[in-house]
């Protein structure tokens, strides 16, 4: 770790120099006094960051726009300069990432090597995955352990502490001419599990809310923000709406979103003991946020990666399966899932093309098992089979 005038200079290595990395995570790290070292695989992004001494984070909301200037960063291409990156990880205070849940396994080997090189004199690095997925840091930790000898796994906690997090901030597609600048909503939530740091102080990072039990925050966020956002996008896409804002101006779509959030709110309040009035206030806030006209959030961007969003622990099937087991209403979630199944062959979205292929080549039962991860013994299974069959039938009718 670098020293300045005898004083320790805090350093964070962040994997993924995309919009969330630059606009959300790095912004808070910068504001907390960290030097940020971005690790990315794109030459163009790394070169731009290294050639430009600052970029802007532009927060937009009903009350106006605020700009923040980010400085004190560097970028390393993790594909071509691994040795350099290893040294940075070995001396970092914090290692974060926003690469997408499916990419965690690819960044794990270099993080494993870097952590293994850490001096015993240093405090353990705080490793926090900032992904839209439950238990993403746990997933990353398991991948890291796969690349370490058994003896080094045993004492890994002396070199790193792994904390799950829940992040919440809407970052729309950016103007192609915006360069490194990032436009996003003013609202944010970054909740991190305090318990892995039991005998150490948590890292000092502005914007983080440290908690002892993360699950209620993760599920409330995933099953309200992500469920609501995706429901609006998929219904909007199927009705030829351009943005989520446009979709929510349609009363029928707005009603579908509210119904879906009524389904999930029933689960959230019962499961986590959250006050129903508090949850309703949260829902109202979310409806305002996803309907922010200043974000220009395209339905294709919000709907992208339908295979992941239709999976077992995700925003539709996850809560719907739990509600179905309890005999509770999950009809609006099923309607949203149907719209997601119809999100096929969308330009610049590989998963939507893969979804179309899976739907065309498999039985409804196979699709429900493969895509949704449901077992025939689960109460939701026959309902999803019926929906998949209907979507497949409609596709066949369209081709005749």
Swiss-Prot record:
Reactions catalysed: D-mannitol 1-phosphate + NAD(+) = beta-D-fructose 6-phosphate + NADH + H(+)
Positions annotated as active site in the UniProt record: 221
Keyword presence, Mitochondrion: no
Amino-acid positions noted as binding NAD(+) in the UniProt annotation, renumbered to this chain: 12-23
GO molecular function (one): mannitol-1-phosphate 5-dehydrogenase activity
Keyword list, A-Z: NAD, Oxidoreductase
Coiled coil segments of this chain: none
Enzyme Commission designation: 1.1.1.17
InterPro entries: 6-PGluconate_DH-like_C_sf, 6PGD_dom2, Mannitol_1_phos_5_DH, Mannitol_DH, Mannitol_DH_C, Mannitol_DH_N, NAD(P)-bd_dom_sf
A single Gene Ontology CC term: cytosol
Domain of life (superkingdom): Eukaryota
Listed GO biological process terms: mannitol catabolic process
Any matching Pfam family: Mannitol_dh_C
Subunit note: Monomer.
General function of this protein: Catalyzes the NAD(H)-dependent interconversion of D-fructose 6-phosphate and D-mannitol 1-phosphate in the mannitol metabolic pathway.
NCBIfam families: PRK02318.2-5
Stated family: Belongs to the mannitol dehydrogenase family.
HAMAP family in UniProt: Mannitol_dehydrog (MF_00196)
Name of the protein described by the UniProt record: Mannitol-1-phosphate 5-dehydrogenase
The organism of origin for this protein: Pyricularia oryzae (strain 70-15 / ATCC MYA-4617 / FGSC 8958)
